[in-house]
Every structure is written in C-alpha cells, then in structure tokens.
A protein has these predicted regions:
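N-terminal module-boundary/linker segments of secreted carbohydrate-active enzymes
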Residues: 27-98, 360-373
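N-terminal substrate-binding region of glycoside hydrolase catalytic domains
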Residues: 57-159, 303-306, 332
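Substrate-binding cleft of secreted/luminal carbohydrate-active enzymes
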Residues: 63-76, 295-373
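Hydrophobic faces of well-ordered beta-strands that scaffold small-molecule active sites
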Residues: 71-73, 97-101, 127-129, 175-179, ...
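Alpha-helical scaffolding within the catalytic cores
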Residues: 79-88, 109-119, 159-164, 230-248, ...
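Substrate-binding cleft of extracellular glycoside hydrolase catalytic domains
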Residues: 108, 115-222, 226
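Glycoside hydrolase catalytic-domain groove-lining segments
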Residues: 111-132, 251-307
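Aromatic-lined carbohydrate-recognition surfaces of secreted/lumenal glycan-active proteins
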Residues: 214-240, 293-306, 333
C-alpha cells in the first residue's frame, strides 16, 4: 500500500469513529431520544474497506461468524422447581442462560417474589417473565373486568403494578419482562385488540402507562419485550400493518419477540401442516424487522412429534436455520406437554437432538453479552 493510500484509509476510519461516538453522545443528551431502559453500549459499525492487507491470492473470503444466540427453557414448574434443568445441563455440558415462567395478575405467581429472581440469578441464569393481566382461569372467555379500559387504564391496578415496579427496582439485576403478549385478535386474552372492546390505541396507552409506573420507580433493570403473535397464512403486508399499528415505538421497547410453533397437521390455530422453523418465521420476521430496529427474541418455540421428525426439526432449526435470521438473539423452548407434545423429552431422539445442538459454541453465549448487544 503506498503512503497516500494509507493516509486516505486512516482518515476514513477516523471519520467513521467520530460519527459513531458523536451519534452516541447526542443520543445520550437529547431529550427526545431518552427512554426508560438501561444505557446501552455504542456498537462500532463494521467496515468492509480493503486495507490492503489481503494475501497475494486476493481478499480474505472468511465469513463473519453468525450472531450468538442465547438458549432458554420454559417449564410449568418454573421457578419453583428447577431440577429438570440440571439433567439438560449435565447432558449438554452447558448452562441454560434464560429461565422463563408466567405470572398472572390474578392467578399463578401474582405477587412479586424476589426469591424467584434470586434463585435464578444464583445459578447464573437470566429470568424471563411473561406478565399477563388476567386470572388465567377462563381461557377462551372474554373476562370483561380485565379489559384494558376496565382494568389497567382505570387505575384499578396501580398499586399492584407499583408493587412489581418497586420490587424489580430493589432487585436491581436484569430481568426480561414480556408484558401483555400476543395482543392482536387473540381469543384467549382479555387485553387483546378486538376482545372486550379493546382498541389498538387502548393497547398502546396501556403499555406506556405500565412502563411509566416502572419508570417512576427507577426500575431500569427491566428489559421490556413486545411480542405479537404469528398469524397463520398471513401475507407480509398484513403482518407489517398489524404490527405497526400496535408497536409502542423503539423508545418504549427493549426487545421484540415472536413465538414459533410447528403445529403439524393437528391444530387449527397453526398452519395445519408440518413446517420448519424457517417456514414459520420468515414472513413475520421480515415484517417485524421492518417495524422495529430492536433485537428479536423467540420466547416460545416448539414442535410437535406428529407429521414429521421432531428430532430433525430441532437439529435443523438450531444448527442451520437460525443463521438465516441475524436479528434473533434468543430462543426459548416451550417445554410442555400441552396441546401437543412440545416437551423436549417427548422422544429420546428429540431430547438427544436438543442436547447435541445446545452444545454448539454459537448457542452458548453468556447472558452479559446478550444484554449488551
């Protein structure tokens, strides 16, 4: 490389660094860019500029390593009983970084319990809580008392929300909180748009209302997940318009989420056919990444045994297909025998596939790297 070319390259790199750090500083000091989330580290933009360091055979063609993905598991016994995790971890030789459970405002795990969070943190894992404003006992029923206007927006739950906000702030360590998920036209959930007279504006107002209570308690350790659901057979434009109408905005959200199920031929809320993870995820992924700039989590993932090889589904999903979706940063398995045998030990071959895939270096990212990304 001649001296003139070297100086040009150095100048270009310095300009890029100045732009990145200048943007980061502006973001941290401009009121309209402030939000309730923790400060995030600035990420340097990669440069593809040829610095003249390639070999005589041409430029280095090595690919950039895929983005690390953090694994997690949900089981109905969590967080009270974490014993099943020990077997999974012993088999794979890896800790499960994310432990997921559900908390219903009027039912299971209603009260904030710091002991649950401490137990998960003590084992080196990150808590993920799906926080549901309902009783959980009347699935398929509207529960009009839990509509957004009769519930959250009436102020009826302010003291309850505040108890969680203050508890989270006192706990102080990171928590992933998935609030009021799958919020569009879902017949199960009284907070969903189209149920109990809830509108998109009601949902957006409720989201910001709850976040505001957490902000006043300085619960900045909470990472908020906005998680719509996958609409079987919908077009990309339908997905995008639906998501856009319900998205609170990047300043109100830390992560976005999508739930991915291979329902096979048996469930009418699925595709009624066997689908790979890539087939289920591709269209909603394009839509949600067009609507939001945030990283994507998959808080519920499962496959049936009926209609194909679940073992192969797991292997392909975790070893090959995830790389097609670079914004995905976590995959949490729905380890439950429920509508289908979503559970990992539904067959010995399925469990063996999970154990083998979970041992990949790409799927062993630690939680600190995940939170700073």
């Amino acid at each position: 490389m001649d001296k003139h070319r070297f100086l040009v390259v150095v100048l270009a790199v310095l300009v890029q660094l100045a732009a990145v750090f200048g943007a980061a500083r502006a973001e941290s000091t401009t009121p309209e860019n402030s939000d309730y989330s923790q400060p995030r580290l600035p990420v340097l933009v990669e440069t593809t500029m040829d610095l003249g360091l390639s070999s005589a055979r041409g430029r280095d063609q090595r690919s950039v390593p895929p983005t690390p993905v953090v694994l997690g598991i949900y089981q109905p016994s969590f967080p009270n009983d974490l014993s099943q995790l020990s077997d999974y971890e012993r088999r794979s030789g890896r800790k499960i970084p994310i432990i997921h459970w559900y908390a219903q405002w009027g039912g299971w795990k209603s009260a904030f319990d710091r002991n649950d969070l401490e137990a998960v943190s003590a084992r080196g894992s990150l808590p993920m809580i799906t926080w549901e404003p309902w009783t959980g006992s009347a699935q398929g029923q509207p529960e009009p008392n839990w509509s957004l206007r009769n519930g959250i927006l009436s102020g009826r739950f302010d003291a309850y929300i505040d108890s969680w906000a203050r508890g989270m702030a006192a706990y102080g360590k990171p928590v992933l909180l998935r609030f009021a998920h799958e919020m569009h036209d879902h017949p199960f959930y009284p907070w969903a748009v189209g149920i109990n007279g809830n509108s998109a504006e009601d949902y957006l107002t409720a989201w910001r209302y709850v976040r505001g209570i957490f902000a006043r308690s300085n619960a900045t350790n909470v990472h908020w997940i906005w998680n719509p659901h996958v609409i079987a057979g919908a077009s990309e434009s339908t997905y995008e318009s639906t998501y856009r109408a319900l998205y609170p905005g990047d300043s109100e959200v830390d992560w976005v989420g999508l739930d991915v199920y291979n329902t096979g031929p048996d469930l009418d809320w699925g595709s009624a056919r066997w689908q790979s993870l890539a087939q289920v995820l591709s269209t909603p992924y394009r839509a949600i990444t067009a609507v939001s700039s945030k990283g994507l989590l998959l808080p519920e993932v499962g496959s049936t045994e009926n209609g194909g090889s679940k073992s192969q589904w797991i292997t392909t999903a975790l070893t090959t297909e995830l790389a097609q979706f670079p914004r995905v940063r976590a995959l949490v398995w729905f380890d439950v025998d429920k509508e289908q045998q979503w559970n990992l030990n539904s067959s010995q071959s399925a469990l063996q596939s999970w154990v083998a895939a979970a041992a990949q270096p790409r799927l062993s990212a630690d939680v600190s790297m995940f939170l700073l990304s």
